[in-house]
Amino acid sequence: MTLWINGDWITGQGASRVKRNPVSGEVLWQGNDADAAQVEQACRAARAAFPRWARLSLAERQVVVERFAGLLESNKAELTAIIARETGKPRWEAATEVTAMINKIAISIKAYHVRTGEQRSEMPDGAASLRHRPHGVLAVFGPYNFPGHLPNGHIVPALLAGNTIIFKPSELTPWSGEAVMRLWQQAGLPPGVLNLVQGGRETGQALSALEDLDGLLFTGRANTGYQLHRQLSGQPEKILALEMGGNNPLIIDEVADIDAAVHLTIQSAFVTAGQRCTCARRLLLKSGAQGDAFLARLVAVSQRLTPGNWDDEPQPFIGGLISEQAAQQVVTAWQQLEAMGGRTLLAPRLLQSETSLLTPGIIEMTGVAGVPDEEVFGPLLRVWRYDSFEEAILMANNTRFGLSCGLVSPEREKFDQLLLEARAGIVNWNKPLTGAASTAPFGGIGASGNHRPSAWYAADYCAWPMASLESDSLTLPATLNPGLDFSDEVVR
């Protein structure tokens, strides 16, 4: 029984699904998808639970959410192993994900008060008040690269605001989704407040097509995000938050410490086996001898990165990709770039057949025409050389995406110029592209999102504002508008 609907674990009535460790092939989870009827059942449960959950005080809802944080802490080792085994991440990285989930609770509570709390302004004859109300029933679509942390970034603020939820994890990480749901169950969420439906495309389509849905919060690929946007077009009453990918540029200008710059680049491009939406996909490198030396060092250090299993000792920097198919897609993308005229500096290699262990790849594309503006979701870095900083900014902005952008340079003036001209929601200076502050919004423009950034701003799309003018008494104004006569004379 792998679906959680209205406070009960039930068996899915859809297609059967098996999840294996992407490196070893070990069977980790087996179950059945939710069919359309069960998706509707989850929606009815969420709708029925909404009035009571929304009427609770924030303090009462916060008690449950903080209890969940405590359960994350006490079950950290177990959840770390589940995420690592299911995604292929090394143990150390899965542990950082669980830590981020724990920290998200306090951050979301603070953000609720700052972004969507209550305000009151006194007026001569009363007061003006601002409150925020929950939307109702929200669907949360989770991704596979952070199967705990990223859905958590939607679920926690949505619950705090008083919404009820139908959560569909990625079909590639059903075990992690179920494990997190069981902790919410232990935290004491009332039946129907949070429901879990497992499944792939068919389940997702049934969920997004629900008429009684008040909103959908999505993290994933741009193509799917565009499909959801089209599906919900003409329904302005539904909130839609899309956090999608990026074809992210990292500009390496002047470098004082080559090894430090190489380390930053590897952290930007290859952490999580290149499976972060903010990962550097395009390296824009200044022409000249220093750029040549940097590139040679980057290739040399990257060549030493050997991906390993989640529990290998010593621990590897990167593990496997989410699946053998995902790893093969990266290899295919590299082969296509090479066929277009790209110059391979480091060829990506599958270490074993029927595994997702893939070494990083680096390919130079300077002067190659018609390079696709697509996100290759894996450890493949494309390199372009530039002559002037103005040219670098033009190259950085030459994408339909707009998630993250970074600059390595000792010159503050160049960063200030980039801040003015870059088209990206995250613009970093001498910091990895994959780094983001917990007290900042997270999202992009263009094909990277629909102007609904998450993280610190997630509270914004989890509630709607209600403005009020209030007075505890009613009296006739001392001065009336022209044409109003409240005298005692009888009009004949």
Curated annotation (Swiss-Prot):
Pathway assigned in UniProt: Amino-acid degradation; L-arginine degradation via AST pathway; L-glutamate and succinate from L-arginine: step 4/5
MF (Gene Ontology): succinylglutamate-semialdehyde dehydrogenase activity
Keywords tagged on the record: Arginine metabolism, NAD, Oxidoreductase
Residues binding NAD(+): G220, R221, A222, N223, T224, G225
Key word Nucleus present: no
Active site (catalytic residues): E243, C277
GO biological process, one term: arginine catabolic process to glutamate
Taxonomy, superkingdom: Bacteria
Catalyses which reaction(s): N-succinyl-L-glutamate 5-semialdehyde + NAD(+) + H2O = N-succinyl-L-glutamate + NADH + 2 H(+)
CDD domains: ALDH_SGSD_AstD
EC number: 1.2.1.71
Function per UniProt: Catalyzes the NAD-dependent reduction of succinylglutamate semialdehyde into succinylglutamate.
Family under the similarity heading: Belongs to the aldehyde dehydrogenase family. AstD subfamily.
Protein name, entry field: N-succinylglutamate 5-semialdehyde dehydrogenase
Origin species: Shigella boydii serotype 18 (strain CDC 3083-94 / BS512)
Lineage, uppermost ranks: Bacteria, Pseudomonadati, Pseudomonadota, Gammaproteobacteria, Enterobacterales
Gene: astD
